[in-house]
Amino acid sequence: MPRPTGKKFDKRRQQQNPLFKRKKFCRFTAAGVEQIDYKDTETLKDFIGENGKITPARLTGTKAHYQRQLDTAIKRARFLALLPYTDQHKA
């Protein structure tokens, strides 16, 4: 028996599941960013987890092109002491 599809089914499924995930989108593409700046620490902090790890693109929705730039920018900012390596270092 085929699974029910269509708008009605999708809305019902969203209402039933309180943990329904929204479609991810790339923040940098939406903003029209060409290069990610390592000096913009406020933006970079959004992509670092509680334990100091860089959040993967599959969780943030960032495109691969920007994820590579983001990775490099975070590493540069850490090297220049603009960002801490872990959350235990208070800056």
UniProtKB/Swiss-Prot annotation:
Subunit structure: Part of the 30S ribosomal subunit. Forms a tight heterodimer with protein bS6.
Family according to the record: Belongs to the bacterial ribosomal protein bS18 family.
Descriptive protein name: Small ribosomal subunit protein bS18
Encoding gene, per UniProt annotation: rpsR
UniProt entry tagged with the keyword Cell cycle: no
Role this protein plays: Binds as a heterodimer with protein bS6 to the central domain of the 16S rRNA, where it helps stabilize the platform of the 30S subunit.
Entry keyword RNA-binding: yes
GO cellular component: cytosolic small ribosomal subunit
UniProt keyword annotations, A-Z: Ribonucleoprotein, Ribosomal protein, RNA-binding, rRNA-binding
